[in-house]
Amino acid sequence: MFYLKKLLRQLLAPLCKHGSYTHLQLFVMGEACVPGKCVLTMFLTNKKFLNKEVTEKFYNEFFAIWLRCRPETRLITKRLFNKMVMTKGLFVLLAYLYFVYRQCKVLELLSLYKLKTIKWVDVETRFRVYPPYKLNKLLEMPSFSEINELHMFLFEQQLLLPIPTHVNLPCMRLFCLRDYEQTETVMLRYRQREHVLSFPSMLRKYALKSPAGNFMFTMAKALVENFCFSADRYLIPVEHNNLVPMVPSKPERGDFPKILTFALATSLKDGLATSVISLPVMCYCKTKCSRFILEESYICVICAKCGHCLNSGKEKLCSPQGFSLSSMFYFRDKQEKNLIYSMHTDVMYCSLCGSQQLVFERIYEMSEHCVLGMKVKTVSWKAVIGTNSACTILNDNVKFDVIVPCSCRSCYSTVHLYNVTVKKLLRLVSHGSDFQCQRCQHSFRETCLDLEDCVNICQGCQISQNVRCI
């Protein structure tokens, strides 16, 4: 079965016409940079089984490679699958095995959610003893049930199609770093005596049976996480131009300290796990009049640990990585809640992850700062997306929904925009765009610039009047 990996590299690898780390991105984000350039995109489908059009396209390319292959390759194929003639069923099986092979390569670096870590050698060993009559049935008529039965035999779990990204915290799959929670060796200082020398061996012997794990490492993780949450700036000692925690490029120098690995993962999580995105302001003519502002306007409650917006209401924001937030937890009153309020401790919790680290963030805010003795006013616009993984919307082909402030200068309500791409989102706050709520479409409210006898013009109207549009 050593020839199986060689066969997959010769026949399937030429169908992957892309750059480095594309397979890693495919398993982490569930999206391909350039559609149609990787054979694994066959498994990116919302249907029950593979997409027929994509499968037919790659099968035609694969068949051209098969016609040019050497006789030794065809002999290996006959020996492994007892098939001399190439069929579409055999191509689907080879594509699935290549999918499993690439999954095993990715799992050597990362521990991905709901994907069981298994070595490729073990996969080959299990595939060798797969019943021949089931394999022949799969080759004659490939279907999801047949492929799923083979997947259950190899991994002892269901096959998830498309490539599984249905998780509560999508981008945290990247930060489930491989084996960083393993128990460290206990360092002890002791005298060279016989009864003392047996003490470390006794600790190691009974530590394997203890369900508590490494309590010192757990406390250190809590300290690091709380510090990264409370501090605005901090330094993590990582070697120059070396991503050892994620890609161990220098194994001869030993393992990277696991607590630093966790610190790096926490730092990246705080920067990427969010459902609020800052928008570039290309035009200040939409700066809102301060006469209509309310204290509770445009405040969204964000869980600092999982990054979800917890007060989006009944709005269902569609996104490729999203899931229904309002249907996660039900209480005795059968009402949908995203926040849990404890009457005993007088503390609020996130109903999705149970964290107490809740922050309040405004999606529209006008602030004033003092820089080198000069007063500088800034206007910030933000959008709320339906997933907590901000990196998933960076693909131009992905469409998603957002909640943004109303573009009317006298309104402090929100608008739900459908099927937005990242390019449209970046050009949203510009002179030519208009996104008003239903209330503004049927009513007119005067701002400071509309009043003839207005003496004191608010800051928002001053900015809208004096700043030149781009």
UniProtKB/Swiss-Prot annotation:
One of its GO terms (biological process) is viral process. This is Protein U33. It comes from Human herpesvirus 6A (strain Uganda-1102). It holds the Pfam family Herpes_UL49_1. It comes from the Viruses. One of its GO terms (cellular component) is viral tegument. Disulfide bonds: none annotated. Belongs to the herpesviridae UL49 family.
